[in-house]
């Protein structure tokens, strides 16, 4: 399930980065880019957790919701004194790790990001394939 979630988001991000040129170089009709909203603030955003074996470097924020921080495994999380986020040596500074189980306002931040991710996915999935 984690693989499917990450694959879906990866497909979404790939679709967003597509610049509207076909394989043979002809220009396609410009379609507005998919608005990621606050989901675009995350390098990894998941509803089901994320795991690493320690051979990972994430350049940006990691977030999970509605599942708790315990679903982020292998990152050796270090909780910030505010309890709003944690850090990891595997998440490049200034990247942070966010989870719905952390102190307010983090749960609200994560709910909004997940909602924005789902809205962006629905938008991208509903578009006509240019090929």
Feature annotation, model-predicted:
Residues 4-20:
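Cleavable N-terminal signal peptides of Sec/SRP-targeted secreted and luminal proteins
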Residues 16-131:
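Solvent-exposed adhesion/ligand-recognition segments of exported proteins
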